[in-house]
């Protein structure tokens, strides 16, 4: 069984580049707080734009698409979904809205994770909405010639619930350590979530929702105004390269979190 342990974030051996980046982000957050009060109308408009971009981009990463006009209509509740892809888009909208409006009341635990997944998958009538996978899954990579290979084998279905419980406990333990920087902890937790791959479908989109949830809960709400998901989609080759490098050796506790942390 994979061991979830984030104590390495408090061993004084973190790369200076990561320390410098987090320092800059904290400084920018302080500046943003002042701008919000001075330019409230601008931030309201940015939030509206970013919400559409987030819903569009997070789904586009998974090949779920429709026209920009239809996405805007769905996000703004001015039109109902017309097909399966649009139902998936509506589901992400609903889960994202849940985080935007109620993140203070959503803890990082099994109840919240299953609720977000159920909210996201219910509009598309997924029979496993809000439920962990029932069969083992693999992450397959297809090269330019159409050849497939197994890139990663996630946690087996019968070990998923226990793995998710251990992930939650490890996160809570790390949160109680005042010497662990939350900005560095969050990408580690998200990487582990992706490697567990607890659901039959929707793991990638869930990882982005959980990223936003944890960022918001720790006072980093830039994702409300500049789409976090759009940035991943824009640089997805770099994102997937970092994910692949950081997931190598994960099942034997030999992986390196730093590439994914740096990308995050």
Show the residue positions of the predicted features:
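FIC/Doc superfamily catalytic core
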Residues: 1-264
């Amino acid at each position: 069984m994979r061991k979830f342990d984030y104590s390495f974030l408090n061993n004084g051996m973190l790369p200076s580049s990561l320390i410098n980046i987090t320092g800059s982000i904290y400084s920018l957050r302080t500046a943003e707080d002042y701008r919000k009060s001075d330019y409230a109308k601008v931030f309201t408009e940015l939030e509206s734009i970013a919400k559409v971009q987030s819903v569009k981009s997070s789904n586009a990463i998974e090949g779920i698409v429709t026209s920009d006009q239809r996405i805007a209509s769905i996000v703004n509740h001015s039109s109902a979904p017309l097909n399966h892809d649009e139902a998936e888009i509506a589901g992400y909208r609903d889960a994202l809205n849940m985080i935007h409006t109620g993140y203070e009341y959503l803890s990082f635990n099994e109840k919240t994770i299953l609720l977000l997944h159920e909210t996201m998958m219910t509009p598309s009538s997924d029979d496993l909405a809000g439920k962990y996978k029932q069969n083992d899954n693999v992450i397959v990579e297809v090269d330019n010639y159409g050849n497939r290979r197994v890139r990663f084998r996630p946690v087996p279905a019968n070990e998923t619930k226990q793995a998710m419980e251990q992930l939650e406990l490890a996160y809570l333990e790390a949160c109680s350590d005042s010497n662990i920087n939350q900005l560095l902890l969050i990408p580690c937790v998200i990487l582990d979530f992706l490697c567990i791959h607890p659901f039959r479908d929707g793991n990638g989109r869930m990882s982005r929702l959980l990223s936003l949830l944890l960022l918001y809960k720790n006072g980093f709400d830039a994702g409300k105004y500049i789409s976090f998901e759009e940035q991943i989609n824009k640089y997805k080759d770099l994102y997937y390269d970092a994910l692949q490098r950081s997931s190598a050796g994960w099942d034997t506790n030999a992986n390196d979190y730093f590439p994914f942390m740096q990308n995050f």
